[in-house]
Amino acid sequence: MKVYAVLGDPIEHSLSPVMHNAAFQAMGLQASYHAFRVKIPRLRDAILGADAMGFGGLNLTIPLKESAISVVEPDETAEAIGAANTVSFQRGIRGHNTDGIGASLALRHYGVNVRGADVLLIGAGGAARAIAYQLSKDGAEIVVTNRTPERGLALASDLGLEFRPFGEIDDLVRVSDVVINATSVGMRDGDPRLFDGSILKAEQVVFDIIYSRETELLRDARRAGAKAIDGVMMLVYQGAAAFRIWTGLDEPVDVMEAAVRAALGRLNL
């Protein structure tokens, strides 16, 4: 039996085990998927240990994605992004990044074509970098903003994008076709709003990559009549891409989505 896992800190919230175990079962694979809490200083030990023990593959989540680049041999996408969320062991210890394609496919799933669209990307972490990289390839006109300007500037500089200070966020939202929250703001009760939701318009798309709950940002978007997209399908599509990397098989997307939505339904009862 092949063993797979997601590593992160915190990790208790992850729905990756539910999603991937459903996929393995649906495809008749002798495999199991687990979640392990790993801190950044032990990431190298964890990845090398997984390789030594014959793991089939790993996913990486907050805060490990950027640190992993120094441990793995990154593929072209992971190297360009500067972060890896997937590790394979078939041909050495390879790092991949499926977050960007996950976000791109999630937007397409809901009928959103970003080619030529003005996209405001809020955030500068590993997920934000992946989204910026992929949507730029998809033809979007991206402006990056972030509460910590140094990180936002670094992302924009690395990928050849425009950065604007977070203090301008209301004006940036007003002129954007698509607004993407790639931060953790909204994941917890009491989180402050990123901006005044009343400025949103019906013709806009609001994509919040948080999948564990309906955020205030998405509620504001729905009140405005805008298209509101949560992070569920990004989670599913990035997981599906990882599944294909590990197994070489067509991913059972419908099964993975159903498993995630069922788990979320239980969590939010």
UniProtKB/Swiss-Prot annotation:
Catalytic activity field: shikimate + NADP(+) = 3-dehydroshikimate + NADPH + H(+)
Enzyme Commission numbers on file: 1.1.1.25
CDD domains per the UniProt record, alphabetical: NAD_bind_Shikimate_DH
GO BP: any one term: chorismate biosynthetic process
UniProt-annotated catalytic positions: K65 (proton acceptor)
Binding, NADP(+): E76, G123, A124, G125, G126, A127, N146, R147, T148, P149, E150, R151, I209, G231
Pathway terms, separated by semicolons: Metabolic intermediate biosynthesis; chorismate biosynthesis; chorismate from D-erythrose 4-phosphate and phosphoenolpyruvate: step 4/7
Function, in words: Involved in the biosynthesis of the chorismate, which leads to the biosynthesis of aromatic amino acids. Catalyzes the reversible NADPH linked reduction of 3-dehydroshikimate (DHSA) to yield shikimate (SA).
Protein name: Shikimate dehydrogenase (NADP(+))
Organism: Methanothrix thermoacetophila (strain DSM 6194 / JCM 14653 / NBRC 101360 / PT) (Methanosaeta thermophila)
